[in-house]
Curated annotation (Swiss-Prot):
Family: Belongs to the JMY family.
Residue ranges, compositional bias (Low complexity): 601-619
Sample GO molecular function, one term: actin binding
Name of the protein in its database record: Junction-mediating and -regulatory protein
Biased composition (Acidic residues): 830-846
The species this protein was found in: Danio rerio
GO biological process per UniProt: 'de novo' actin filament nucleation; actin polymerization-dependent cell motility; Arp2/3 complex-mediated actin nucleation; cellular response to starvation; DNA repair; intrinsic apoptotic signaling pathway by p53 class mediator; positive regulation of apoptotic process
Alphabetic keyword roster: Actin-binding, Coiled coil, Cytoplasm, Cytoplasmic vesicle, Cytoskeleton, DNA damage, DNA repair, Lipoprotein, Membrane, Nucleus
Domain (WH2) ranges: 779-796
Length: 846
């Protein structure tokens, strides 16, 4: 209800203040009553002895001060010499005159206060017999105990009879006795009714009577506050009774009464704060309406420059009023949720204390209420924190606008630093509130999950009983096509809801981590800003600090460049010592090449026998008859491999076009390694072999082969495929062990140089190709993978680009400092609420 409607409904009613006649301090009053012969009336005089006593003390103090001033003036006149006065004494005399004038002004003010106090300390008036009776009737209306206390007054003639007979004559003795009785009566009336009422009856003044009345809006607010206090006292009484309850039945009944009392508390609080919010809501609506009218006038009407300027000033004024109303609404909202959240927390804590007094079976009857109360506590606290968050956001917005509106001046930079530090403090408070919000959201989810799990356990433990049937036909006849859902369907729905809540809790955890990182950035910026302010307070300029940072950066860059040059020199010396084409491949490329090479070797094994590699093979010393060449497949090998000497008389029978040789005797067998072949002595010159097969083109060519003698095909009995595979596995294990030892013992660059020196690496020229994305790499570092997953890219606004351009082109140091401060506070602040995936307030209603 608006205030205009209240005025229309409540017109004609007045509200008197309840304690308007209470006296804050008791004073001593004295009444003097005398008979005035000329007027024929009683002269009543009242003196406030308390005020008169204070005035007398004040007079004595003032007289003492005047005496000291007079003595000081006499001393100055005696010590002064008019004929020979020095300039210093002239200056001292000129300086003493203002102090004397000030003291005189104080004396005048004290005299005025004394005069007003004396006027308020004494009252006088003339009262006839009829006037005294009328005053007595008014005092009896206040307190009926005064009715028999008025002394007997003679009857006074009225009208024509007063002209004919005049005033009744009384003797002096009767008059004095009646005056004494009236003095006693007035003293008793003072004690019974109080000075405020008696003074207004006997000595009425012409002051405004508004002090005795109060506005109806204040009366209504007082009524709402009284209702709220009654609801609080009722709930507090029930909470006190809860401690003494020992039976579960009584406790459940008390819980229902507490719920009713809390409902009354919420209702009273809502009515009170709705009434308090109403004027601010009206002001906000009025301000928005007036601003809209001003906007329409500026857009549609043809106005002069003065009128346009006045409308703009009026618009700014209404905007300030609307902003003030919004801040007041937010503050009242915070107070409302503080009241409700505090009451629910007390109820929940008392219920947890009751849970420890009862067993699990007995407490099962109150589990639902406890879950409901826990959910309500988290929800109210969440709304309270969101209201506080809105208030802090408004303050941050005001600070940001003030920073943007700073003008050039002497204290502009200092004010900018102060505003930025204040912004960081508000942001840290906001982070604490946001952490509390996430905590309460997680508590809400936990309460819902506990309730769902309890419902699922109840569904699983539920026993369903069916009626018995005499025959299957009777069972089919009673089948209902529209059967209710089975417990399994209910459990599936509850499980689905549980998964949704678990996913939402995961998002809350991610938001916590994000806010934690932002808070660390804010703390770092705030610490730096405080250090800069302290350095500025001690007179330390920022220029040496910047110079030190630049020098440190230059030293770091020079150190990196020197290290790079040293590495290049080492590689150059290595190339000079070991000439040849060397290409260093990264670990990632080496792994890819090794996988590709292993795949090619497996493909070759499916087509032919395994290739001969450098290995130590142990064979039998006794010769064996060789199988025909068609029965044993020939082994293909690179040209760089050493040929094996023949055995016995099998050499004469070998065809001249044989590509491979047989194995030598065991006593002549040596370790053959293709990597160490340049260092070993060359074999005897064999005849030139035929051209290599096409499948061996991938192997790098080595030194041209020497002519060898034709040999027959070797027997599988001496060098079969299983022995070759075992030898290959041993070589791989040895190479991996050796490489791991070298990796642990030295740095990566030393490992590469040493391996190249001993010839264990066969390097080839790397091909330039686009590599596929690494499966082990995190998708968060790959923007293309993020785009494929559907991550939305935030569009850079044109205003931001223009602002950056302005900041880059601006030569004003204040403008650059403002932009830098805004950039820092933007880094320390979280992203907008529209970009995160936090659940809205409506999600918690389910």
């Amino acid at each position: 209800m608006s205030f205009a409607m209240e005025d229309a409904i409540e017109s004609g009613w007045v509200s008197v203040r309840p304690n308007v006649f209470e006296e804050k301090e008791k004073h001593k009053f004295v009444f003097i009553v005398a008979w005035n012969e000329i007027e024929g009336k009683f002269a009543v005089t009242c003196h406030n002895r308390t005020v008169q006593k204070r005035s007398a003390e004040r007079d004595s103090l003032l007289e003492a001060a005047e005496g000291e001033l007079a003595a000081a003036a006499d001393t100055d006149r005696r010590t002064a010499r008019p004929a020979h006065r020095s300039p210093g004494r002239e200056r001292s005399g000129g300086q003493s005159s203002p102090s004397a004038a000030a003291e005189l002004e104080l004396l005048d003010a004290a005299e005025d206060a004394e005069l007003s106090a004396r006027q308020d300390s004494s009252w006088a008036g003339l009262f006839s017999f009829q006037d005294l009776r009328a005053a007595h009737l008014q005092l009896c209306a206040v307190n009926a105990d005064l009715e028999p206390c008025l002394p007997a007054l003679p009857e006074e003639q009225t009208g024509v009879w007063s002209v004919l007979f005049g005033v009744p004559e009384m003797s002096a003795r009767d008059t004095d006795a009646l005056c004494f009785q009236l003095q006693v009566y007035l003293g008793h009336a003072l004690d019974t009714c109080g000075w405020r009422i008696l003074s207004q009856v006997l000595f009425p003044d012409s002051e405004d009577a508004e002090e005795y009345y109060e506005s109806l809006s204040e009366l209504r607010q007082k009524g709402y506050e009284d209702a709220l206090q009654r609801a609080k006292r009722r709930l507090q009484q029930l909470l006190e009774q809860q401690r003494a309850v020992e039976r579960m039945v009584e406790l459940l009944q008390l819980y229902s009464e507490q719920d009713e009392a809390y409902g009354e508390l919420v209702e009273a609080t809502t009515e009170l704060y709705h009434y308090l919010l109403q004027p601010f809501r009206d002001m906000r609506e009025l301000a928005m309406l007036r601003r809209q009218q001003i906007k329409i006038s500026l857009e549609t009407e043809r106005l002069g420059p003065r009128r346009v300027e006045s409308l703009r000033r009026e618009d700014e004024d209404w905007q300030r009023k609307a902003h003030t109303a919004v801040l007041s609404i937010q503050d009242l909202t915070v107070k409302y949720f503080e009241t409700t959240a505090r009451a629910q927390k007390v109820m929940y804590e008392r219920m947890r204390a009751d849970q420890r007094k009862f067993g699990k079976a007995a407490w099962g009857a109150a589990v639902e209420r406890m879950e409901r109360l826990q959910y309500a506590v988290s929800k109210e606290t969440l709304q309270l924190m969101r209201a506080k968050e809105i208030c802090l956001e408004q303050r941050k917005h005001g600070l940001r606008e003030e920073m943007q509106g700073l003008q050039g001046g002497e204290d502009a930079m200092a004010r900018l630093d102060q505003l930025e530090a204040l912004y960081y403090e508000l942001q840290l408070q906001l982070y604490e509130i946001q952490f509390e919000i996430l905590k309460n959201e997680e508590l809400l989810l936990t309460a819902q999950l506990q309730s769902l799990r309890r419902q699922m356990s109840e569904r699983q433990e539920e026993v369903v009983y069916y009626d018995t049937f005499e025959s299957p036909d009777a069972m089919k006849a009673t089948e209902d096509p529209a059967q209710p859902q089975t417990p399994r369907d209910d459990i599936n729905k509850l499980q689905q809801r549980t998964r949704q809540l678990e996913a939402r809790r995961g998002r809350i955890t991610a938001k916590k981590a994000y806010l934690k990182n932002k808070k660390e950035i804010c703390i770092i910026n705030h610490t730096q800003k405080l250090q800069q302010r302290q350095a500025g307070a001690h007179g330390v300029s920022q220029q040496p600090l910047l110079q030190d940072e630049e020098d440190e950066e230059e030293q770091r860059l020079s150190r990196v460049s020197q290290e790079r040059q040293r590495t290049l020199d080492r590689l150059r010396s290595f190339k000079q010592r070991y000439p040849g084409q060397v290409t260093l491949k990264s670990t990632r490329l080496r792994l890819a090449f090794s996988r590709k090479k292993a795949l090619r070797a497996e493909q070759m094994q499916t087509q032919t026998q395994p290739q001969t590699q450098a290995a130590s093979v142990q064979t039998d010393d006794a010769p064996a008859p060789l199988e025909p060449p068609s029965a044993v497949p020939e082994l293909c090998r690179p040209d760089s491999f050493l040929s094996l000497p023949p055995m016995g008389g099998a050499v004469a029978e070998a065809p001249p076009s044989a590509e491979l040789t047989s194995l030598p005797p065991a006593r002549e067998l040596l370790l053959l390694d293709s990597s160490t072949s340049p260092m070993s002595p060359p074999p005897p010159p064999p005849p030139p072999p035929p051209p290599p097969p096409p499948m061996l083109e991938d192997f790098p060519p080595r030194s041209p082969p020497e002519p060898q003698s034709p040999l027959g095909p070797f027997s599988a009995r001496f060098f079969d495929s299983s022995q070759l595979l075992n030898a290959r596995k041993k070589l791989r294990k040895t190479a991996s062990l050796e490489s791991s030892q070298w990796r642990r013992a030295s740095s990566p660059m030393d490992e590469v140089l040493a391996s190249l020196k001993r010839g264990s690496f066969h390097l080839r020229k790397a091909e330039l190709r686009v590599l596929a994305p690494d499966p082990d790499e995190d998708d968060g570092n790959n923007i293309l993978a993020q785009i494929r997953k559907g991550v939305k890219l935030r569009k850079v606004r044109r205003q931001e680009r223009s602002a950056r351009a302005i900041m880059a082109d601006s030569a004003d140091p204040l403008t650059r400092s403002i932009h830098e401060a805004l950039r820092r506070i933007k880094e320390a602040s979280p992203e907008s609420e529209s970009e995160d995936d936090t659940p809205t307030a409506t999600d918690w209603e389910s």
